[in-house]
């Protein structure tokens, strides 16, 4: 969940030019133009905003924010009225990349918000909260995806029904291919269902978004594992292509000796699965979690909510986690708080978990010990762990590898009834060993094609355990590769900036204002009727930075924040209610208006108002659309660069003529 607690209260001022240091005189002189000799005239350059460049799913974030704020309008019908509400239009733009916005709007750590240029003004745009709102709107209004007009007759097997598998199934179905998902669980969802607690991803929300994908005609075979229940050879015979979205639902044991066959030392994945299956309803009085990422936070907060039962036996929770039994639901009326400690080799401020989740965990009474590592397990005569011995350490990443240095003499024992290892995940390759690259993962190229296996693609945690949004992005890119393979088309090179972006040509066609034949090499001209006047799309190779914007245009505007139910040590016990409420219509529009539309015109009129030669003018309404709002009369333009200086979004660049 992205719910940053920090607020920028200092109002800032901005300058385009800084005091000139000697080494910068030449560069600054280059920006001083005179009417008699300047040859630099404005061109309109579409760039990718850093929010989209930071989004692993590749969402057109700027696009749906511009729709929500009213800059980009839905298409109109013959009666002159919009064919759909702005909420639906924004949702459809969002779901071109991500079919699970209601889920991701709740649990995604939102790297897009970290990259947001608005951070240089006062605070990031609440992108995650807008996504949450649109996902909720779609469920409430039963919005469905549009089925393809025709089918290709090609069949694709998707192994695994987690975020990667659902993403590729969705994208392939839209392309007209028949998809069958094989999953060895009772329900689809992968880690969204069996890893993340239900109070973070409500099951009715998850079910609704999964069902919408299945409504495209996707077939499902549950409790069926390829490699054991059905052979890979049979899959290859029955299907034209295969996607491996196996996930990484196995846990990694503690990296200390003596943990084998110790019943009260478990992995995070088995702990969370037992909880999400409904088998685990209480734990021991003292729980120690070893980790530092978001999964370890989930384990710790679940343990805090479950609490312990004084009359229970250790075998009760151990058997539930092992899948051997389910605890008696009647016992939960007697639950008491559990003491939960979470250890991490990194200091708390450098932990991999998102800061808001760390803050919530600490508020709920979880003791987070940063800079500690496990060194030994203390066991009794029955081979049960009674404590975890830890010592202080210094950890850092060197060349992509974790290096940990123990601090001698700092050891201490943490008494524990249950120890949970949340230090990583592993992949079960049973029956599919041929795909194991020897490092417990699958090797692919940049299009996620499995090396040496034509027609086989992979994505998600089988490549590298990462975020849910990363798995969704893998699925979308793999779907493009599978589609090209099935159609016999040679796979093209993926763009440098591989995300969904605003498509001006599509928007012109949508409005019915396409001028002649579209020809990319001519897009920068002002004479050809087959091109858009002085426009260049560099979205596939360029992310625009904050120092290319006119930040002084943007007034200090606090972020519209979602309401979060904050729990303490007492109120967390037994509380499994969702704690995050979506924004309402007014709030979400207000939040979208904070977007600076980096790299694309948002129709502020600054360039028209401030041009001293009236060279910049508005395009006729019958020919204009988003991204084609203004143009330049080069017979009047003197190259003074004022239009560029006052362009808030960095859409205008003084490059034409160079």
Give the location of each predicted region.
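A conserved short coil-to-beta-strand element within the FAD-binding core of flavoproteins
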Residues: 222-236, 371-383, 394-395
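Short, well-ordered alpha-helix to beta-strand connector turns
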Residues: 217, 239, 262, 284-285, ...
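Ferredoxin-type iron-sulfur electron-transfer modules and their immediate structural context
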Residues: 1-155, 203, 242-261, 269, ...
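Rossmann-like dinucleotide/flavin-binding elements
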Residues: 158-182, 222-231, 250, 270-355, ...
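Active-site rim loops that border cofactor/substrate pockets in soluble metabolic enzymes
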Residues: 386-403
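Glycine/threonine-rich flexible loop motifs
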Residues: 253-257, 399-406, 430-435
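Beta1-alpha1 glycine-rich phosphate/pyrophosphate-binding loop at the start
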Residues: 27, 59-82, 91-93, 120, ...
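Short gly/ser/thr-rich secondary-structure transition/capping motifs
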Residues: 136-143, 223-226, 267-274, 398-406, ...
């Amino acid at each position: 969940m992205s719910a940053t607690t920090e607020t920028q209260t200092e109002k800032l001022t901005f300058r385009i030019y800084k005091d000139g240091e000697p080494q910068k005189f030449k560069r600054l002189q280059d920006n001083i133009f005179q009417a008699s000799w300047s040859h630099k005239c404005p061109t309109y350059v579409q760039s990718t905003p850093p929010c989209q460049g930071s989004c692993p799913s590749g969402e057109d974030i700027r696009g749906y924010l511009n729709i929500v704020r009213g800059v980009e309008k839905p298409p109109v019908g013959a009666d002159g009225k919009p064919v759909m509400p702005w909420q639906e239009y924004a949702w459809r733009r969002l779901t071109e990349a991500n079919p699970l916005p209601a889920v991701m709007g709740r649990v995604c750590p939102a790297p897009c918000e970290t990259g947001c240029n608005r951070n240089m003004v006062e605070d990031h745009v609440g992108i995650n909260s807008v996504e949450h709102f649109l996902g909720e709107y779609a469920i409430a209004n039963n919005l469905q995806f549009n089925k393809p007009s025709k089918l290709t007759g090609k069949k694709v097997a998707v192994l695994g029904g987690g975020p990667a598998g659902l993403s590729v199934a969705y994208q392939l179905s839209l392309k007209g291919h028949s998809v069958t998902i094989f999953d060895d669980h009772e329900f689809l969802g992968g880690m969204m269902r069996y890893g993340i607690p239900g109070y973070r991803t409500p099951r009715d929300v998850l079910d609704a978004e999964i069902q919408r994908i299945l409504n495209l005609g996707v077939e499902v075979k549950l409790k069926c594992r390829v490699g054991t229940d059905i052979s890979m050879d049979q899959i290859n015979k029955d299907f034209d292509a295969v996607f491996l979205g196996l996930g990484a639902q196995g846990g990694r044991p503690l990296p200390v000796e003596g943990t084998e066959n110790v019943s009260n030392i478990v992995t995070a994945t088995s702990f969370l699965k037992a909880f999400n299956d409904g088998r685990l309803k209480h734990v021991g009085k003292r729980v120690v979690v070893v980790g530092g990422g978001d999964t370890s936070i989930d384990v710790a907060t679940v343990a805090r909510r479950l609490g312990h039962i004084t009359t229970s036996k250790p075998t009760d929770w151990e058997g539930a986690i092992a899948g051997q039994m389910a605890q008696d639901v009647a016992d939960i009326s007697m639950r008491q708080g559990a003491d939960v400690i979470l250890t991490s080799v990194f200091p708390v401020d450098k932990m991999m978990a998102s800061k808001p989740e760390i803050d919530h965990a600490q508020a709920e009474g979880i003791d987070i010990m940063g800079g500690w590592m496990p060194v030994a397990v203390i066991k009794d005569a029955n081979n049960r762990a009674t404590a975890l011995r830890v010592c202080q350490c210094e950890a850092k990443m060197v060349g992509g590898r974790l290096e940990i240095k123990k601090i001698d003499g700092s050891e201490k024992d943490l008494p524990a009834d249950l120890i949970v290892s949340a230090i990583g995940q592993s992949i079960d390759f049973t029956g599919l060993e041929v795909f194991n690259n020897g490092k417990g993962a699958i090797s692919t190229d940049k299009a996620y094609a499995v090396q040496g296996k034509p027609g086989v693609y992979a994505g998600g945690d089988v490549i590298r355990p990462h975020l849910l949004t990363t798995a969704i992005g893998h699925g979308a890119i793999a779907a493009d590769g599978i589609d090209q393979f099935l159609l016999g088309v040679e796979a093209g090179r993926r763009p440098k900036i591989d995300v969904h972006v605003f498509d001006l040509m599509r928007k012109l066609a949508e409005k019915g204002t396409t001028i002649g034949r579209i020809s990319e090499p001519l897009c920068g001209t002002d004479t050809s009727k087959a091109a858009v006047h002085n426009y260049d799309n560099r979205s596939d190779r360029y992310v625009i930075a904050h120092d290319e914007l006119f930040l002084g245009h943007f007034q200090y505007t606090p972020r519209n924040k979602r309401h979060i139910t904050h729990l303490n040590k007492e109120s967390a016990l037994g509380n499994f209610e969702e704690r995050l409420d979506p924004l309402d219509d007014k709030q979400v529009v207000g939040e979208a208006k904070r977007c600076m539309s980096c790299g694309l015109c948002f129709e502020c009129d600054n360039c028209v108002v401030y041009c001293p030669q009236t060279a910049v003018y508005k395009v006729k309404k019958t020919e204009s659309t988003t991204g084609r709002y203004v143009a330049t009369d080069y017979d009047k333009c003197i190259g003074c660069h004022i239009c560029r200086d006052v362009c808030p979004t960095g859409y205008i660049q003084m490059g034409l003529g160079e």
